[in-house]
């Protein structure tokens, strides 16, 4: 059975936070545009490659006008701690760096942004459900299904800039990963299977 990604169910299970609530908690300006950044390392590449990827993305970020960014830190993969140190050094009024937003704030913030930048699986799986444009950088997610709201690009500054220039055309809802009712369908399929098994046993 194909039921979708259970993680999508969180959007329907939670009461998402408002823009004003997010602005207050994250010390952001609600009148500015927001973008969400999560950049993990590419473990098959060198540390220099990964730091260059982060630097290229940052250079694109500071060129955006009237935009504030929330950067969630990289995971524990090779190179992740160095990427996090890089972001910590770049934090300012328009670049907020957090270790984690937590599920509710993350989903709420994603629903309010102009786009998602980086290479996190949340840009591949969760963002399409909301129709939020995604600029997927590099090869970390290579081989996964790419929904119609996702723009894939290389790691150079020029490629990232070009991809961001297209985001207005990529605000497209894509429910390839599910409709938010995967858990219900899983439970129902298990019940149906057990009922069929009981009938056959009798």
Stretches found by the model and what they are:
Residues 1-3, 98-99, 151-156:
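Short acidic-hydrophobic, aromatic-tinged amphipathic segments that line or gate anion-handling sites
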Residues 65-100:
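Catalytic donor nucleotide-activated moiety binding site of glycosyltransferases and closely related
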Residues 1-50:
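A nucleotide-sugar donor-handling region in carbohydrate enzymes
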Residues 52-66:
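Short hydrophobic signal-anchor/transmembrane segments that target glycosyltransferases
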Residues 166-202:
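C-terminal amphipathic helix plus adjacent low-complexity
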Residues 102-146:
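A donor-sugar binding/catalytic signature common to diverse glycosyltransferases
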Residues 128-172:
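Nucleotide-sugar donor-binding patch of glycosyltransferase catalytic domains
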């Amino acid at each position: 059975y194909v039921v979708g990604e259970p993680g999508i169910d969180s959007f329907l299970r939670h009461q998402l936070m408002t823009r004003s609530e997010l602005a207050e908690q994250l010390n952001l300006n609600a009148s500015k545009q927001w973008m969400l950044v999560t950049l993990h390392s590419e473990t098959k590449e060198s540390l220099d490659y990964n730091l260059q990827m982060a630097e290229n993305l940052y250079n694109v970020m500071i060129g955006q006008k009237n935009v504030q960014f929330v950067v969630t830190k990289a995971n524990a993969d090779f190179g992740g701690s160095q990427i996090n140190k890089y972001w910590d050094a770049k934090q300012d009024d328009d670049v907020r760096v957090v270790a984690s937003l937590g599920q509710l704030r993350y989903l709420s913030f994603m629903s309010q942004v102009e786009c998602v930048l980086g290479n996190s699986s949340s840009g591949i799986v969760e963002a399409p459900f909301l129709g939020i444009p995604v600029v997927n950088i590099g090869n970390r997610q290579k081989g996964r299904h790419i929904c119609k709201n996702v723009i894939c690009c290389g790691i150079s500054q020029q490629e990232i800039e070009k991809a961001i220039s297209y985001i207005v055309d990529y605000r497209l809802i894509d429910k390839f990963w599910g409709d938010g009712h995967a858990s219900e369908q899983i439970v129902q399929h298990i019940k149906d299977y057990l009922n069929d098994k009981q009938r056959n046993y009798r």
